[in-house]
Amino acid sequence: MLKIKNKLGIIVNARYKILDLSYIDEIMRLQDNIMEQLEDKQLYAPTEREEFISYLKDGGKIIGYVDEKNELIAMAVYIKKGYEEGNYGYDLDLEGEKLLEVAQVESTVVRSDYRGNGLQRILCEKIEDIAKSEGVKILASTASPYNKYSVNTFIKLGYEIKKDKLKYGGLRRYVLAKEI
């Protein structure tokens, strides 16, 4: 149990959950909520429902926190993409079996009324634990250079900015990576 404050200053007990397909509607609702509230839409590249489903079916993990009403307030996606073109290892100029050593933090979102509690950092630390348990050597992610909060969270966690490039249909992104 994690004690956090919502934007009204009320202390809330948040519970860590490993999410499964039964949470797909809540996952989409949380992501839609984030997108609606973003003034600058280029800060976040949304994931399609089918992608979330395939991540769960293909060995990925979606983890998150729920509030006392069991509503999803934050989530993060962990996935290993192997030789698939979406593997950030390609962005890091890795080849061959080195690509199999890469896992990624595919998405992290925190509901606006719970920001400022370090939930993104906590979820990324939990993903790092998952990655270590699976023998992953490199953890990678992307973040908009204009999203200073996400970039700073990754930097504080020991990630380095490895590339600055256009991804996701022309959005500028830092590719960040960390050896674990």
Where are these regions (language model features)?
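Conserved acetyl-CoA-binding loop-helix of GNAT-fold acetyltransferases
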Residues: 107-110, 116-129, 152, 156
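Conserved acyl-donor/pantetheine-binding loop and adjacent beta-alpha core of acyl/acetyltransferases
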Residues: 75-107
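Conserved beta-strand-loop-alpha-helix junction that forms the acyl-donor binding cleft
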Residues: 115, 141-151, 169
